[in-house]
Amino acid sequence: MRLATIRTESGTRAVRLDADRAVETGDADVGALLRGADWRDRAAAAAGPTYPLDGLDYAPLVPTPEKIICVGANYRDHIKEMGREPPPYPTLFAKFPPTLIGAYDDVLLPAVSEAVDWEAELAVVIGRPTRHVTAEQAPAAIAGYTVLNDVSVRDYQNRTLQWLQGKMFEATTPIGPALVTPDELFSGTDPAAGLSAEITTEVDGEVLQRSDTDQLVFGAYMLIAYISEIITLNPGDVIATGTPGGVGHARKPPRYLIDGAVLTTRIAGVGELRNTCRKEKV
C-alpha cells in the first residue's frame, strides 16, 4: 500500500494511491492517519473522494511530525570519502517541520549561503508508539519507507562541531511522495535482512550519488532500537537514515546547488523526488 498527503482546494488530505487513482482516507494528512491504531485497516478500506494520479500536488508526506531524527556518517562509501572511520554508535541530529517540503516543491536555497549540498536518504516513518525495543522487534514499529533529501548548508553546518544550524534551514528538505508499506517492498523477500534498493541523486540529469541502502552501517532496525533507548518514537515520526557517497562538498573542487538546478532523488521501489532549486530573495 502507498499513502500520501496531497494539497486540495479544501486543505491537505491523506490518500491511498491506487494504480489508477488517489482515494481519500478521511484524514488531514498521513501523520494524522497514523495516529489511529487501526490506520492500516482504515487506509486499505478507504472509499472517500478520488483524484486522478496525474497532477497531484504532494505536500510533505508527514507535514508536522513530532520528531525528525537524522543520522550522519552512516554509509560506508560516504564515510570513506570524508576520510573517517565507521562510528561505534549512530550519529544523531534533528530537523524541524518547517524544513520539510513536498516531493515536487521548490527547494529554497538560503540567501546567506552559496554552499548548499544534496544528500539522498531513505527515510523510515514510525507507525506505533515504540520504546525500548530490540532490532528484532523494530520491524513492527515501521509504518513504511519514503524518500528524503537532507539538503545541507555546508558553511553553516561546519561552523561548529554541532551540525544542527546547517540542517534546519526552512523549505530545504523534500520528503515523499509516498509512504510505502513494508509488505509491498518486501514481497517475496525476507524483511529481517533489511531493505536493499538502489539510491541515487541527479542534478540536472547528471548522476552524482549512486549506492544501495544495504550499505548502511546502522540499518533501520538497529536505528529504531537505539533511538528507542533514548526517547519514545511516536506515529508519524521520521528517521532519515543517512546519505551515501557523492555529496558535493566532498568533491574536488566542491560542487553545490545553484538557482534553477533540478534535484532528483530516487530510491528503487520507494519513489522519486524532483525539486527545482530557487534562490531565496530577501
Which residues does each predicted region cover?
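N-terminal non-catalytic cap/leader segment that marks the start of a structured domain
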Residues: 1-90, 192, 200, 206-207, ...
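Catalytic-pocket segment enriched in acidic/His residues
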Residues: 9-10, 51, 78, 84, ...
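A generic local secondary-structure boundary/capping motif
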Residues: 4, 58-60, 81-83, 107-116, ...
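RNA pseudouridine synthases
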Residues: 126, 133-148
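Structural signature of FAD isoalloxazine-binding scaffolds in flavoprotein oxidoreductases
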Residues: 86-103, 118, 258-269
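Short, structured patches in soluble enzyme cores that scaffold and shape functional sites
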Residues: 7, 95, 111, 118-122, ...
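Residue-level recognition of short, solvent-exposed, well-ordered loop/turn junctions
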Residues: 63, 70, 117-119, 234, ...
